[in-house]
Amino acid sequence: MQAVFLARSRMLFLTSDGKPPARFSFYVASKEGTTGRNQVRRRVSRMNITFLLNGETVELSDVDPTATLLDWLREDRGLTGTKEGCNEGDCGACTVMVTDEGGAKALNSCILFLPQLHGKAVRTVEGASGPNGEAHPAQQAMVDLHGSQCGFCTPGFVMSMVASHTNGATDHDTQLAGNLCRCTGYAPIIRAAKAAEEHPVPVWVKDKPVAPQATSSMLPGSSDELAAVYAKRPDATLVAGATDVGLWVTKQLRDLDPVIFLNRCDDLKEIAITDDEIRFGAMVDMNRMGGALAGLHPSYAEMIRRYASVQVRHAATVGGNIANGSPIGDNPPALIALGATLHLRKGDARRSIPLEDFFIDYGKQDRAPGEFVEAVSFPRQTDRLKTYKLSKRFDQDISAVCGCFYITVSDGTVTQARIAFGGMAAIPKRATNVEAALIGKPWTHETIQAALPSFAKDFTPLTDMRASATYRLETAKAMLERYFLEDQGETTNVLEVSA
């Protein structure tokens, strides 16, 4: 019997011939215990990349497009301070700080592919301390205030704190929501984060991104270049933030090739706000989207804050959250309620469709081979939007139900209603029968009660691990009632009850 270690999947198998099991035939184990899966066949998407690691320039040739930063740090560079906990972007143990033209960001290295780092600066926990061993204020505060017990999660917390300290962020509950600790109860960690505020940002962590030239057509530098290469390779997987695709590799062990990375398409990162329209490019990350919406639709911005951790929101994109077609995505229902239009491109051809028409069925969207999401837009309008996210955990959890309501009233009569839900059907879906039961009726509690039976006409939700069908349906009804009560000035704030 021989042991075969598959580093990408963190699995150890005992086999008679020293070869990986058939299911994992695309892996080839090396003596060092790292994966050599690219020895099986020549990959289309291999590329050369350049970035900074803890202040030093790194140039990598012939890079596996789905090699994660976490694996590379630990196995190729011997930087084992960055830990693997969940390997899906939930626990924060693998957090690193990545600096690009938008500033310093905390990101999960377990679902961050190496080509996404091209031109950026990476700092790990080993690089948080100074050149002469000086502790970063976050590190020193964690020591002084007893923020570490077993220590496994500590490097991730430190790097989240280093990133927030670099940016001057002081909303520590939010900044650390993506880091889990099973020992401390969090109080000493929060105290450490607050204590670090009193100290200036060390000069050694003030990284600047590099500006290398493009090295591969699979790393397009604009939407025009993307359109050209995707038209030639419509079979390619598009990678924006990898918060979803990353799990295809780390959890499903899928072999992706070819892969096109969108991180250099700066024109897809534009936000345009005019008197008439609000438009988000497909590569706008969720943190930037939330910031742009804070003064326009604060309920939407708050929902985005709860949508996922800071690390995930820095990576997840507007376009990716739409294109994956998830029935439990939080972004599409809110956009549908705002009357959003989706802008798609294939080669030089462009088309625009109502966002709700993009979702056809579970796993099926109105997107042709070689076509990609370019932007999403919606009218600039008076804020009548409310979003309600129901999940088992308050922060960083998948919704059981996400309800979004935009109802306009004139002279006591409902003149317009756009209501959309996630978690209630196989796709993000409008409640058209409920809308019809409201429009033209008096804006009264009696009208709300009369509209509630229409929910059963619009939705037949499933029972799963997050909620039962009955619970989902009753909750959706309660959300409409909550919208009405809040519009009437009633207080419906959810109280946090301690155990």
Where do the language-model regions lie?
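Immediate flanking context of iron-sulfur cluster ligation sites
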Residues: 71-92, 127-152, 165-182, 309-315
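Short, contiguous acidic and Ser/Thr-rich linear segments
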Residues: 58-64
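C-terminal structural segment of proteins
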Residues: 57, 97-98, 102, 106-109, ...
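Short, Lys/Arg-enriched N-terminal segments with co-localized hydrophobic residues
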Residues: 27, 31-46
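Eukaryote-biased recognition of intrinsically disordered, low-complexity regulatory segments
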Residues: 47-56
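Acidic (E/D-rich), amphipathic helical modules within compact regulatory domains
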Residues: 86, 90-95, 103-114
